Amino acid sequence: DGAVDALVHTARRTGFRGRWEQVSENPRVICDIGHNEHGLKYNFTQLKRMLESGEISKLIVLYGSVADKDVDAAVRLFPDNATYIFTRAQGKRAMPAEEVRGKYLALCAEDGRPVAQTYCCETVADAGRLAYQLVESCEKAGALPADVLIYVGGSTYVVSEFLAIKA
């Protein structure tokens, strides 16, 4: 289909990065700059399907947002069976990681959802290091690196900082 082809090849054609971009295979790392409810709904639906199908056994979400986005709507879309690392990008518009975590915990309490394992990191670099440490812990517990997925998203700024660290 033409739309799928356009999305898949956008990065190569334009140099534009961060749209469902797999930046690593072992462990698998996918970055996506989707930051509104529509984009995040698509992303989190894909991640839920990957977990449910057994394509991955462990999901680690590295997530940050800017303060003017509807984080309450975003956290409603989060998969229940993931580990969350909340972070903030550099810049004045970034929402503090603890505030994003607080919104997630409030939603869980309000909706009776199970609370996932959560962490907060003040920088994207620290969040990235923690994500890779969690992958190592999964491997020590018997998971294969290909069974673990790190998803980086919530903000163009978070993805950009992560990609700069990976470069």
Give the residues covered by each predicted segment.
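C-terminal helical cap/extension that packs against the catalytic core
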Residues: R28-V29, A74-V148
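Active-site-proximal loop/hinge segments that shape catalytic or ion-binding/gating pockets
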Residues: S155
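Short, hydrophobic alpha-helical segments
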Residues: L47-L51, A131, V135-E139, K166
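Short glycine-/acidic-enriched loop or helix-start segments at secondary-structure transitions
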Residues: L40-K41, V71-A73, P96-A97, E161-A164
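Acidic, glycine-rich flexible loop segments
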Residues: V152
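Alpha-helical structural signal in soluble globular domains
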Residues: Q46, M50, L77, K103-E110, ...
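Nucleotide phosphate-binding/pyrophosphate-handling subdomain across enzymes
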Residues: D1-T83
